[in-house]
Amino acid sequence: MGKHHQNLLNNLEELRKLAGLTQQDLSESAEVSRKSINAIENGIYVPSTVLALKIAKTLKCNVEDLFKLP
């Protein structure tokens, strides 16, 4: 599992790269800033449910593939 916040593990960076997307590409699709995507990838920020769903839709995966409880 990739980076983690104390309450959430995430695979966002790995799955984003597998999809061939940059942070900027993903941020535009999810309608957030590139800095927000970076903060999520580095475990600094936990996304809202809506944002997590937008990211999963863009990456064509389930939210559970992206984020897990420790």
Task: Please annotate each region the language model reported.
Residues 1-18:
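A short, Lys/Arg-rich alpha-helix, primarily the initiator
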Residues 10, 21, 47-50:
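Residue-level signal for the short linker/turn that defines the boundary of a DNA-recognition helix
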Residues 50-65:
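DNA major-groove recognition helix of helix-turn-helix/homeodomain DNA-binding modules
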